[in-house]
């Protein structure tokens, strides 16, 4: 997504956990597009890091126009008893608590026309039984975005969420059993998983002037799985 925004003329701040080589590659692509990338290493599950990310964006780039909440953590578990307490907490801290702290820190800097986007999931409506904590956070993100759209509308700030279906990201092979990875996305009407490049344009639209009347929406990018 950072690359897609850069290609449309945006400078970007990217928070990443530990993937130094991946972050450097994103920075290279952003700079190839003629824009600036500021990388911040840290854990968004830490509220202070969330505040530091926003402060860095304001200090280094002069302000914030778009806030994309895209960090996620998940693990596949086949029974409730198998979910460790700390894993439940980490899932909520990374997926929804971080969004709260990022939004709270960012809103005072957002001007009319700014955009907040949250990454929900098809799991918000069709929760997988083996991804219970993750699915719960994705439903929370969708509802939080819907609340913020109403809360911030008078300030001219638009808020939307995106509900991806199966998309190939590093999260998939690192958190799913091999037999599920092999068939990932094959049960969608389109018969395959999506690529990040097929998802990113939706985020660009929601942040652009072309999406100036889109707020309070949840956009499904699911390969044909309906969200009604």
Where are these regions (language model features)?
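Active-site helix of classical SDR
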Residues: 103, 137, 145
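Short, small/polar-rich loop/turn modules that mediate ligand/substrate recognition or access, typified
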Residues: 153, 158, 214-216
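Substrate-binding pocket helix/loop in short-chain dehydrogenase/reductase
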Residues: 78-80, 84-92, 180, 184
């Amino acid at each position: 997504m950072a690359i897609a925004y850069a290609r449309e003329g945006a400078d970007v701040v990217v928070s990443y956990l530990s993937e130094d080589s991946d972050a450097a590659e994103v920075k290279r692509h952003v700079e190839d597009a003629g824009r600036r990338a500021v990388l911040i290493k840290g854990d968004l599950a830490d509220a202070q890091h969330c505040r530091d990310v926003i402060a860095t964006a304001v200090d280094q780039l002069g302000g914030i126009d778009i806030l994309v909440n895209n960090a996620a953590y998940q693990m596949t578990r086949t029974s409730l008893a198998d979910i460790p307490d700390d894993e439940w907490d980490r899932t909520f801290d990374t997926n929804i608590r971080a969004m709260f702290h990022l939004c709270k820190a960012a809103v005072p800097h957002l001007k009319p026309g700014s955009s907040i986007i949250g990454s929900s999931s098809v799991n918000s409506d069709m929760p997988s039984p083996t991804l219970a904590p993750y699915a719960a956070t994705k439903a929370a993100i969708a509802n939080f975005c819907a609340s913020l759209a109403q809360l911030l509308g008078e300030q001219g700030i638009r808020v939307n969420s995106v509900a991806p279906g199966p998309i190939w990201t590093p999260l998939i092979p690192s958190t799913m059993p091999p037999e599920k990875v092999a068939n990932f996305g094959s049960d969608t009407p389109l018969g395959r998983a999506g690529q990040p490049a097929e998802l990113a344009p939706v985020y660009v639209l929601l942040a652009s002037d072309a999406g100036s009347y889109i707020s309070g929406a949840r956009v499904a990018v699911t390969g044909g799985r309906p969200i009604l």
